A protein has these predicted regions:
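Conserved CoA-thioester-binding segment of acyl-CoA-metabolizing enzymes
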Residues: 2-89, 125
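Glycine-rich beta-to-alpha active-site loop
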Residues: 124-171, 200-201
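C-terminal long alpha-helix characteristic of the crotonase
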Residues: 157-162, 212-263, 276, 293-299
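Short helix- or helix-capping micro-motifs
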Residues: 96-97, 190-199
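Hydrophobic, secondary-structure "cap" segments at the distal end of domains
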Residues: 179-189
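Glycine- (often His-adjacent) and acidic-residue-rich active-site loop
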Residues: 63, 73-81, 87-123, 142
């Protein structure tokens, strides 16, 4: 930091480093990054351009998050992102893949279609594995790839009347790229059923099977519920949130014996206890004060 200033280098402000987006609306407010899909005329359908913009912004958030930096602020003193809110402008969250793009894929080579599929998976994995806590605000429909976006998020609040569907089978294709993420969220039986039915489920059904986490009665309630979950997550240590995601992935991927898994959890617990956040959290508890990552309401 000091060396760069001595050499006359200008350090770019955090907000100035955000990737340029034409099909997304981006708002960074302190530690909260809000991303709004903004193809309202086509119900926020996914095409290659918006997919790439989503990849870029989620990658930027991962690289500049408080968890990645292991600090609440950057070297220049700017507050780093801890929470990402994903929503859609207009009446609908996301109607899935742009039908014209899908139709054009029939004229593409296998290699070109695989490249598109790989890019879509890069998006889903970038959301699912993001070190920030991700919140989805859903209204209208979340179909196909839109349902995939929902499945990748950590906490999903849907407005009453919203519909979710893995509708690919109605078009003679499969929910294969979104599959791993929906499968992890729903489990085998529900994924299998919905993948074959392809029909839309309402918010009550989505809540029952775990596709969403909360139902909001209207847009005002959607905002209120979002504020509540933000308040809760800001009492959690940011790097520990990232490690919780990694721990879950380790459990999902584990193919070894139970003894090795137990050894892994013991090692992880020991590392976290002795780490910066662990020491701050334990110290705060003993001293009966808030840990340094907790943001008070007035802030």
């Amino acid at each position: 930091m000091k060396n760069m200033e001595y050499l006359g280098c200008e350090i770019m402000k955090l907000i100035e480093s955000i990737p340029t987006c034409n099909l997304l609306e981006i708002n960074l407010n302190k530690c909260i990054l809000e991303i709004s899909l903004n193809r309202v005329d086509v119900f926020n359908a996914l095409n290659p351009e918006i997919i790439q913009e989503l990849i870029n912004i989620f990658s930027w958030a991962a690289n500049n998050s408080a968890a990645t930096a292991n600090s609440l602020v950057s070297d220049s003193g700017e507050i780093l992102p801890r929470i990402i809110i994903l929503k859609g402008n207009g009446k609908h969250f996301c109607a899935g893949a742009d039908i014209n793009w899908m139709k054009d894929s029939g004229e593409c080579t296998l290699e070109e279609n695989q490249k598109d599929a790989k890019r879509l998976d890069e998006l889903f994995y970038g959301i699912w594995s993001n070190p920030c806590f991700t919140v989805g605000l859903i209204k209208g429909v979340a179909l196909g790839g839109g349902a995939g976006l929902v499945a990748c998020l950590d906490h999903v609040i849907a407005m009453d009347g919203s519909k979710i569907a893995m509708s690919e089978i109605k078009l003679g294709i499969l929910p294969a790229v979104i599959g791993p993420y929906v499968y992890k969220r729903l489990g085998s039986a529900q994924f299998r059923r919905l993948a074959m039915l392809g029909s839309r489920i309402n918010t009550d059904e989505a809540l029952r099977i775990g596709f969403i986490d909360e139902i909001a009665k209207d847009e005002n309630d959607l905002s209120i519920n979002c504020e509540k979950i933000i308040s809760q997550i800001l009492t959690s240590a940011p790097s520990a949130i990232e490690q919780a995601k990694f721990l879950c992935k380790t459990f999902d991927d584990w193919n070894e014996n139970m003894k090795e898994l137990r050894d892994y959890t013991l090692k992880t617990t020991s590392i976290m206890r002795g780490g910066k956040e662990g020491q701050e959290g334990l110290g705060a508890f003993i001293e009966r004060r808030d840990p340094d990552w907790k943001i008070k309401d007035e802030e």
